[in-house]
Amino acid sequence: MRSEAVPQPGGLERFASPGKGRGLRALRRYAVGELLFSCPAYTAVLTVSERGSHCDGCFARKEGLSKCGRCKQAFYCNVECQKEDWPMHKLECAAMCAFGQNWNPSETVRLTARILAKQKIHPERTQSEKLLAVKEFESHLDKLDNEKRELIQNDIAALHHFYSKHMEYPDNAALVVLFAQVNCNGFTIEDEELSHLGSAIFPDVALMNHSCCPNVIVTYKGTLAEVRAVKEIEPGEEVFTSYIDLLYPTEDRNDRLRDSYFFTCDCRECTMKEKDKEKLKIRKLNDPPSAEAVRDMIKYARNVIEEFRRAKHYKPPSELLEICELSLDKMGAVFEDSNVYMLHMMYQAMGVCLYVQDWEGALRYGQKIIRPYSKHYPSYSLNVASMWLKLGRLYMALENRPAGDKALKKAIAIMEVAHGKDHPYISEIKKELEDH
């Protein structure tokens, strides 16, 4: 690790952040909405469910994509995108044909295979590594428990199983390190409604440390990551992004950070816990619940969130909706509707309604969610923008033009800061407004 500050082009420098290891620091002032830097993906992989609607190469969303002539499972904008993606796609093309229905490596395995291929094709430093090289990634190997090590060994076995014909592997120890690095430093690419599009490696973006009061936000333009200021940043200030969903109270956020990234956050929000009381709001009753009843309900809420996360993989929508409704009923006896655990289950219920195309049901949940979301999340939150966007599109689908108009404009106002005024998503939403 280089401990001295290394100046970089464009008003930013890598430096040794006290107590945090490496970090990124501003050398000049940045205004809200200003682009600090962009970073092309070192490598990226489109999620299987988005094949056919997004280009496997550049992730552009469009109609009429062309199929790969061999496997017929990858889709591209044109010959250029296909040629550019071939060094990566060839790892999977023949294997998908050979394995047929049995071809099912996880996205992490697919991404890691691409990293190995990229390192072989392009061993020198890339345009994605101006500040931080992939080989410098933290792995936190010493902090992995047996369960995490076992999951990594499963991934290594899958890598050998699905990719053995087209790759040379480093030894097992090196693969353990690489998978641990990917787990801590990989990014998920999402669209404007926060639907999952794929996974990618953005080395320079991974240099930024975490805060629950971030001063920048990361968005994506295809496979390009862009980092914009959501607060004014002064020269000498460290640049912080958020690694996690910021809806939840301090204890939950830090549980998540410890589990995934092996540290506890000491930002202002985690120290002062100013938002926790609102986030855990209790229903005002003549006979208020005891502290023990509240503790028990929080425990129940955390369990039901985990139960639902698992159930999503195998239960039908009707049963998933039932889990949401029953848990909301039970929690509602103690929690206010604006309590984050209530909001979590409402959001899941809204997702089920959208899936089964129950637009009215989805709208009812969304209307309950949006105000508390705006309060609990920081300014210019993608979660708030995507909720306004979903609401706007639902209103439009249900012929409520004035409400749709208003909601879509609220989404645009946030996105112009977070995504930049010229982002294709914003042009698409403006077109939706004109077309209705």
UniProtKB/Swiss-Prot annotation:
The entry's Zn(2+) 2-binding residues are C68, C71, H89, C93
Q: Where is this chain's protein located in or outside the cell?
A: Cytoplasm, Cytosol; Nucleus
Where, by residue number, does S-adenosyl-L-methionine bind?
Answer: K20, G21, R22, H140, N209, H210, Y261, F262, F263
* A Pfam family assignment: SET
Q: Does the keyword Nucleus apply?
A: yes
Q: Which PROSITE patterns match?
A: SET, ZF_MYND_1, ZF_MYND_2
Per the record, the zinc finger regions (MYND-type) lie at: 55-93
What are the protein's GO molecular function terms? histone H3K36 methyltransferase activity; histone H3K4 trimethyltransferase activity; protein-lysine N-methyltransferase activity; RNA polymerase II complex binding; zinc ion binding
Reaction equations catalysed: L-lysyl(4)-[histone H3] + 3 S-adenosyl-L-methionine = N(6),N(6),N(6)-trimethyl-L-lysyl(4)-[histone H3] + 3 S-adenosyl-L-homocysteine + 3 H(+); L-lysyl-[protein] + S-adenosyl-L-methionine = N(6)-methyl-L-lysyl-[protein] + S-adenosyl-L-homocysteine + H(+)
Report the sequence similarity comment from the record.
Answer: Belongs to the class V-like SAM-binding methyltransferase superfamily.
| Name of this chain's protein | N-lysine methyltransferase SMYD2
Q: What is the lineage of its organism?
A: Eukaryota, Metazoa, Chordata, Craniata, Vertebrata
**Gene name tied to this protein:** SMYD2
